[in-house]
């Protein structure tokens, strides 16, 4: 990520999360300062053109997950979006945010950005990557089933969630649903699913497993 990308990233954020305040230049600069190699940008250039534009981003930081609780919110895990809790000794890569411009969705960019983050896990010999998956399909059925029942149905394929199903197809595993992960997510009825991808070369020992 470069400072010249900041305006495009803020624009993508405004389009992907219209109810949220876009990232500021100061916040993006802080991310880049704390963990530069963990801020991944995907660019797109039309055929025959050298004028590439930002098409998607994946923001990550390293955490010592034993210092946190699995029910912690996005604000807690990102230190209110400052990434000041990035820990070079951390064994977990936390996927704080992944966004793809609506102009480039369904082109495989989210998968490519996830693969780039997994490469960071492998290259730095981290134990795993952890994230919080929105459950935008849950709000419509929350009155008749619990979040646990909904996530179980999505895992077995009997129900489809626009976000969690895509994560499962991309190799993530569900740990469990949690409440209050994001401040403003009415489509998910305030719920999210903790998901993880374990490094097959150095998986976490039993005392570091998430439950």
Regions found by a protein language model. Name each.
Residues 58-97, 115, 135-162, 168, ...:
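Conserved acyl-donor/pantetheine-binding loop and adjacent beta-alpha core of acyl/acetyltransferases
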Residues 9, 13, 167:
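Hydrophobic pocket/interface hotspot
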Residues 16-67, 72, 78-84:
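Active-site rim helix/loop that mediates acceptor-substrate recognition in acyltransferases
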Residues 44-46, 81-85, 114-126:
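Short amphipathic alpha-helices and their capping/turn segments at secondary-structure boundaries
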Residues 100, 106-123, 129-131:
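Conserved acetyl-CoA-binding loop-helix of GNAT-fold acetyltransferases
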Residues 1, 98-100:
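Hydrophobic adenine-recognition pocket in adenosine-nucleotide-binding enzymes
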Residues 2, 112-120, 124, 175-211:
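C-terminal/domain-terminus segments
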Residues 1-9:
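A short beta-loop-alpha structural element at the N-terminal edge
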């Amino acid at each position: 990520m470069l400072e010249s990308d900041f305006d495009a990233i803020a624009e993508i954020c405004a389009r992907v999360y219209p109810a949220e305040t876009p990232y500021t230049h100061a916040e993006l600069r802080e991310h880049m300062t704390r963990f530069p190699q963990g801020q991944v940008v995907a660019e797109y250039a039309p055929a025959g053109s050298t004028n590439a534009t930002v098409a998607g981003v994946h923001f990550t930081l390293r955490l010592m997950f034993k210092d946190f609780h699995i029910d912690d919110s996005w604000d807690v895990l990102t230190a209110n979006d400052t990434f000041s809790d990035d820990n070079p000794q951390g064994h977990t890569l936390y996927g704080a945010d992944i966004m793809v411009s609506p102009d480039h969705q369904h082109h495989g960019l989210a998968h490519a950005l996830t693969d780039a983050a997994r490469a960071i896990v492998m290259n730095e010999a981290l134990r795993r990557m952890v994230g919080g998956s929105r459950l935008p399909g849950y709000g419509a059925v929350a009155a008749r089933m619990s979040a646990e029942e909904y996530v179980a149905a999505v895992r077995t394929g009997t129900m489809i969630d626009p976000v969690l199903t895509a994560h499962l197809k991309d190799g993530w595993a569900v740990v469990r649903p949690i409440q209050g992960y994001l401040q403003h997510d009415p489509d998910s009825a305030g719920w999210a699913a903790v998901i993880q991808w374990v490094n097959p070369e150095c998986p976490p020992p039993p005392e570091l497993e998430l439950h």
